[in-house]
UniProtKB/Swiss-Prot annotation:
GO terms for molecular function: RNA binding; structural constituent of virion. This is Matrix protein 1. Plays critical roles in virus replication, from virus entry and uncoating to assembly and budding of the virus particle. M1 binding to ribonucleocapsids (RNPs) in nucleus seems to inhibit viral transcription. Interaction of viral NEP with M1-RNP is thought to promote nuclear export of the complex, which is targeted to the virion assembly site at the apical plasma membrane in polarized epithelial cells. Interactions with NA and HA may bring M1, a non-raft-associated protein, into lipid rafts. Forms a continuous shell on the inner side of the lipid bilayer in virion, where it binds the RNP. Influenza B virus genome RNA segment 7 encodes the M1 and BM2 (AC P08383) proteins. Normal translation produces the M1 protein. The M1 termination codon overlaps the BM2 initiation codon in an overlapping stop-start pentanucleotide 5'-UAAUG-3'. Termination of M1 translation triggers reinitiation on the BM2 AUG in the +2 open reading frame. Keywords: Host nucleus, Membrane, RNA-binding, Viral matrix protein, Virion. The keyword Membrane applies. It is found in: Virion membrane; Host nucleus. It is a peripheral membrane protein. One of its GO terms (cellular component) is membrane.
């Protein structure tokens, strides 16, 4: 895969699946695909995207700025504050040393990536801020290599947190993780589905999940609750028993 293709993949790995991710992917392919775009407008779009966290906005915004190092746009607080606000004085010092000494000697994406892998996330965040403020001092390959290494670390942290919740010893947490996943799927289907059948199915899924949440489920007597829910759904013609059996 190309340099820009790798960067798009790492940036998208930060975000959760959904309609917002699909829209972001389309934008990234346009920006990194060689089409001319207005940097200021692109940064405003990223800044106002509600489905992104502050760190995600900062990383995506910085990557777009790296594409146009000669553009003299004003420094954006939504990029600098998350990058400089994490970690301790010691980790920030490590990030500064990394940027000023090691990364200045790098010449390739993979060299920068391998060096960045050996540093903690907070140091890499500060290193990226230094690169963002001094974009002309580093090659695009080095800046994107450092950014992608950080994206991999962030995506790994998110994956571990998600897996921990999915394997939680608390039944309520595991059940809600399944509910949230199902609800996100239903909302995406409803928002992006073009056929009436798809939208109808999405609405039924959301209705079913709403009923399950309203009635709740007992840790000790989940089977009885499941039977009660199926009976309610049958009487109200709101859905199928397969969904109930899966999520209770």
């Amino acid at each position: 895969m190309s340099l820009f293709g790798d960067t798009i993949a790492y940036l998208l790995s930060l975000t959760e699946d959904g309609e917002g991710k699909a829209e972001l992917a389309e934008k990234l392919h346009c920006w990194f695909g060689g089409k001319e775009f207005d940097l200021d407008s692109a940064l405003e779009w990223i800044k106002n995207k509600r489905c992104l966290t502050d760190i995600q906005k900062a990383l995506i915004g910085a990557s777009i700025c790296f594409l146009k190092p000669k553009d003299q746009e004003r420094k954006r607080r939504f990029i600098t504050e998350p990058l400089s606000g994490m970690g301790t004085t010691a980790t920030k010092k490590k990030g500064l040393i990394l940027a000023e000494r090691k990364m200045r000697r790098c010449v390739s994406f993979h060299e920068a990536f391998e060096i960045a892998e050996g540093h903690e996330s907070s140091a890499l965040l500060y290193c990226l801020m230094v690169m963002y403020l001094n974009r002309g001092n580093y090659s695009m390959q080095v800046k994107l290599g450092t950014l992608c290494a950080l994206c991999e670390k962030q995506a790994s942290h998110s994956h571990r947190a998600h897996s921990r919740a999915a394997r939680s010893s608390v039944p309520g947490v595991r059940r809600e993780m399944q509910m949230v996943s199902a609800m996100n799927t239903a909302k995406t289907m409803n928002g992006m589905g073009k056929g009436e059948d798809v939208q109808k199915l999405a609405e039924e899924l959301q209705s079913n999940i709403g009923v399950l949440r309203s009635l709740g489920a007992s840790q000790k007597n989940g089977e009885g609750i499941a039977k009660d829910v199926m009976e309610v759904l049958k009487q109200s013609s709101m859905g199928n028993s397969a969904l109930v059996k899966k999520y209770l």
